[in-house]
Amino acid sequence: MNIKKAKEEIKYAIQAYLAKDEFGEYRIPAVRQRPVLLMGAPGIGKTAVMEQVARECGVALVSYSITHHTRQSAIGLPFISKKEYGGKEYTVTEYTMSEIIASVYDKMEETGLQEGILFIDEINCASETLAPAMLQFLQCKTFGAHKVPEGWLIAAAGNPPEYNKSVREFDVVTLDRVKKIDVEPDFSVWKEYAYQQGIHGAILSYLEIRKDHFYAMETTVDGKRFVTARGWEDLSTILKVYEDMDLPVEEGLIYQYLQHRRIAKDFANYLDLYRKYRTDYRVDDILQGKYTKQAVTKLQDAPFDERLSVMGLLLSRLSEGFRGAYEADLTVTGLHGALLELKDRFNSPYCQETPWENLFTGLLEEREAAFAKERKAGLLEKTAEHACLKELERLHFFLAEGKRSGCREKEEAFALVKGLFAKEAEGRENAIADASAMLDNAFAFLEEAFGAGQEMVIFITELTTNFYSVKFISENGSEKYYRYNAELLFDEKQKTILQDIEKAKTELNLLF
């Protein structure tokens, strides 16, 4: 199963486990809430998917790698206490609360979320002294004498034995108490995630051409050679920072993330080509509608790999524009909500004597506290977090401008803030207009170069895969996207019908 399907299975499990009956009791009792066990190769996104599931379900997440724990930290430290049995006092051994269970309660207190996921990574790599405690944890949902709180799903992840010499295989008794999900690497699924995370365009273009380099694990006389999804994502992050700082990116840097010499060298060579294509084809000029006939002819005559790379450059730049428009929309929507709330406070009969600055400051502090709480709970994805930070920054600016302008009355202050908000709304409209123009220009360039050929099919398919382009087009429209997408769907449907007819003919020939 790919990681996207595994994510859906985990979400469904959470929804089912947290469902309650008319008496407020969990419909599935804790003893029947099987832990979810993800088994798969290292670096394919098992930990990242838990963060996404927790965020999308609005629950807390406590994550631990069991290889960092000893028996004492997992089940608690022993201490001596006195107890009376049958009228006689005895000295007995008890245990402090497990560090892991204590972290669950700390998270509940910090975030206010009473339900969540307790995720234990590398669970089948626990030390020999800790292995019995792990089996007890999976079977009984306890660490030592302390149970995992109700409303918390237990999830764990491990690697198959071929990837880790420290692996201890679970017995049938343990496996019969978990929901085991085997996860396989899948580039097409990871690509959807990559677009949303803003993975470097060169990586996406390269992997589109070299899909077999997305994940590699080889054993040689010199040791392991490997490339993982985690490695590509971390490489993307460092590439962007290096480019922003104008630092050289060499093969040695790439090999630090892609620990497979042949693939690292191949990508380093491709990265040089990718940058050359960006300069040769003047991608920004294309998206501004300033492309030349020579650029069109050059692309028409180019090898297929080069065509894919240029389309990757266009898609990467478009994705940045769509992402910027999405973030601007989130920011303005948040500001609009804040202004409505501010207006209500200004007009409230209970706040007539309160200076406008105090009301504004109180609102700002409340929104900052709410943001800090959501951020602490991990409920915000990166773009939403940036939008919230921008919203708070603009609210601080609005307050400072009101004070600087010497506003005394609430009406005067609100009029000034409303005018400042209008400029932010105009900025959002400009971002949307710019992104729409870039999309139209990209279509115009590709139409002139390839018409409705396979390159256009690939372009439409990639737009449909990208979270930000789908969001942008669904809200702002694109005539050419709708037209080509409809033609593509029609062609696919027609192809399926023809295949079904041929299949039916074959079956009839076999019968007669």
Q: What is each of the regions a protein language model found here?
A:
Residues 1-212:
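AAA+ P-loop NTPase catalytic core and its hallmark functional loops
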Residues 8, 12, 16, 55, ...:
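Charged/polar, solvent-exposed surface patches and flexible loops
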Residues 35-37, 57-67, 80, 89-119, ...:
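Conformational switch/transducer regions in large eukaryotic molecular machines and scaffolds
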Residues 68-69, 146, 200, 213, ...:
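Histidine (H) residue identity feature
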Residues 98, 149, 171, 200, ...:
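Alpha-helix initiation/capping motif
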Residues 300-512:
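Terminal-proximal interaction/regulatory segments of ATP-powered molecular machines
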